[in-house]
């Protein structure tokens, strides 16, 4: 119990040292992740060379902007959207009939877990000091990249 309490206090100390302008240094944490640090190479290298242009009408773009809170007015955003659609169309063609379903990509790896027990952290105020805006001991996040004036309409 004392060992787990010391670990939680260690994380609280790291959180207390960080301020609004800096992020946590995850290399200081004691449990390294098994998730790859670098992205995997593109499974479809010829995807960018595909000139299969499916027209996307303005109503679809407006719907996607509203649902995803992402501004798609720039050419780069439309290019990324078209590339994502082409990638999704290619994934559909991959034969997966004889492939067993996975719950996670790390299914066969041993993960480092700790006992799920309640410990005394008592560092709520230290952690909440890192938030720019708080409300009733909760973090307040921005509503996305849509200005607040548009939300009232």
Curated annotation (Swiss-Prot):
It is found in: Mitochondrion. It catalyses: L-glutamyl-tRNA(Gln) + L-glutamine + ATP + H2O = L-glutaminyl-tRNA(Gln) + L-glutamate + ADP + phosphate + H(+). The keyword Nucleotide-binding applies. Residues 31-55 are annotated as: Disordered. Keywords: ATP-binding, Ligase, Mitochondrion, Nucleotide-binding, Protein biosynthesis. One of its GO terms (cellular component) is glutamyl-tRNA(Gln) amidotransferase complex. One of its GO terms (biological process) is mitochondrial translation. It comes from the Eukaryota. HAMAP family: GatC (MF_00122). Allows the formation of correctly charged Gln-tRNA(Gln) through the transamidation of misacylated Glu-tRNA(Gln) in the mitochondria. The reaction takes place in the presence of glutamine and ATP through an activated gamma-phospho-Glu-tRNA(Gln). This protein may be expected to contain an N-terminal transit peptide but none has been predicted. Belongs to the GatC family. PANTHER family: GLUTAMYL-TRNA(GLN) AMIDOTRANSFERASE SUBUNIT C, MITOCHONDRIAL. This is Glutamyl-tRNA(Gln) amidotransferase subunit C, mitochondrial. It comes from Drosophila willistoni. The lineage of its organism: Eukaryota, Metazoa, Ecdysozoa, Arthropoda, Hexapoda.
């Amino acid at each position: 119990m004392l060992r787990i309490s010391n670990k939680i206090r260690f994380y609280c100390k790291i959180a207390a040292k960080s301020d609004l302008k800096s992020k946590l240094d995850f290399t200081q944490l004691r449990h390294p992740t098994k998730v790859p640090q670098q992205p995997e190479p593109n499974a479809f290298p010829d995807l960018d060379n595909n000139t299969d242009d499916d027209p996307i009408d303005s109503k679809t773009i407006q719907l996607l902007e509203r649902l995803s809170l992402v501004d798609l007015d720039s050419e780069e955003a439309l290019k990324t959207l078209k590339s994502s659609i082409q990638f999704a169309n290619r994934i559909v063609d991959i034969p997966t009939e004889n492939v067993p379903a996975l719950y996670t990509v790390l299914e066969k790896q041993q993960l480092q877990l700790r006992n799920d027990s309640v410990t005394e952290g008592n560092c709520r105020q230290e952690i909440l000091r890192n938030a720019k805006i708080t409300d009733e001991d909760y973090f307040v996040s921005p509503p996305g990249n849509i200005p607040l004036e548009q939300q009232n309409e």
